[in-house]
Amino acid sequence: MTTTTGLRGRWAQGLQPRYFTWVIMDRLGAGERPGGFARNHRKVRRQEELIWLSVHGFTHIVSLLDSPHNLHAYEEAGLASVHVPLGPHDELVPRLEVVYATIGKLLDDPMEKLFVHHEEFGDRLLGVMGGYLLYAGLVDQGTHAISIIEKLTGRSVGSVGREIVAATLDEHLHR
């Protein structure tokens, strides 16, 4: 478990992950990979963001990264994690079903509070979050899912994210 012993004030609270957004209030949050992505990744920032997730009661981190990066850090911080690689674009549809089912199964427990991340807070993650709203039956139209995600994040969902939402509908992925 990450210890905040000796830390005072805002440092004991950690640092909110970059672009953190509630998709389902107090149950499902999303953001950039803790510590940042690729060359911008910083170990100290990752530790601060993991402290924030722990202090705020997150029970699982769902990593959509293709690689197992950060999983050891989550374990060291005492945060349970699930690695569900989103994979390359041409393998997306079969993987979406696994991603959605994993998130859904975790959220079936009312005590679960999830943080989902991809490498960066971009179209792929936004599309998956919009697709999950469809999968879970929280919305029934792709345009509604996209609109909600855009409103929550303050970002436009681009072509890749829209393709993910469309694939969720086209493949009839739902609970």
Model-derived features with residue positions:
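Conserved S/T- and glycine-rich ATP-binding loop of Class I adenylate-forming
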Residues: 118
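Glycine-rich nucleophile elbow surrounding the catalytic serine of serine-hydrolase chemistry
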Residues: 122-128
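Cys-dependent protein tyrosine phosphatase-like superfamily
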Residues: 1-115, 128-175
